[in-house]
């Protein structure tokens, strides 16, 4: 459960991401594909090379979903319901992949915002991304 301090940290950190959200989403995906090659199996139709338009496009989708989750941090299950359905019933993404992408997103944010990425912000973002992952996998059962 996210505390009021966690919610404040997440909103402040994501606010600093701003117009770079799509780029950071794409960078996190690239990190995931390079660090965890098995994740590529969910994207057989994508050009997974560095800077590809498809990875950038999906990175923007990831970032937009996270922006939506931040905006609705007190009601993520409703805000992410359609996305949860998509990943559980159509795409059938292994839930472990959400953890891998979350890790890569944390690394990306830390690399771009080292001064703001304090231990408290890191912990809050980690809890937030875990909450998003829980919501996205809630319909797998």
Curated annotation (Swiss-Prot):
User: Gene3D superfamilies, from UniProt?
Assistant: Globins
Q: Which residues carry this modification: N6-succinyllysine?
A: 7, 11, 16, 40
The molecular function GO annotations come to: haptoglobin binding; heme binding; iron ion binding; organic acid binding; oxygen binding; oxygen carrier activity; peroxidase activity
Q: Identify the residues that the record assigns to the Globin domain, covering every copy.
A: 1-141
Q: Which InterPro entries match?
A: Globin, Globin-like_sf, Globin/Proto, Hemoglobin_a-typ, Hemoglobin_oxygen_transport, Hemoglobin_pi
Question: Residues of the signal sequence?
Answer: none
User: Which Gene Ontology biological process is one annotated for this entry?
Assistant: hydrogen peroxide catabolic process
Q: Name one Pfam family in it.
A: Globin
Q: Report keywords, A-Z.
A: Acetylation, Heme, Iron, Metal-binding, Oxygen transport, Phosphoprotein, Transport
- Chain positions found as N6-acetyllysine: 16
Binding residue positions for heme b: 87
- On this chain, the residues bearing Phosphoserine are 3, 35, 49, 102, 124, 131, 138
The UniProt similarity line reads: Belongs to the globin family.
Q: What is this protein called?
A: Hemoglobin subunit alpha
Q: Which organism is it from?
A: Mico argentatus
């Amino acid at each position: 459960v996210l505390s009021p301090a966690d919610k404040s940290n997440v909103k402040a950190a994501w606010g600093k991401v701003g117009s770079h959200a799509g780029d950071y989403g794409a960078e996190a995906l690239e990190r995931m594909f390079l660090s965890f090659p098995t994740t590529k199996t969910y994207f057989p139709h994508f050009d997974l090379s560095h800077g590809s338009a498809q990875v950038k496009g999906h990175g923007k989708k990831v970032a937009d979903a996270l922006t939506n989750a931040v905006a609705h941090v007190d009601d993520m299950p409703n805000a992410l319901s359609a996305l949860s359905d998509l990943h559980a019933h159509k795409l059938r993404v292994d839930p472990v992949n959400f953890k891998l992408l979350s890790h890569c997103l944390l690394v990306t944010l830390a690399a771009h915002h080292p001064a703001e990425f304090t231990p408290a912000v890191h912990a809050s973002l980690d809890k937030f991304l875990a909450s998003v992952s829980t919501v996205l996998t809630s319909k797998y059962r």
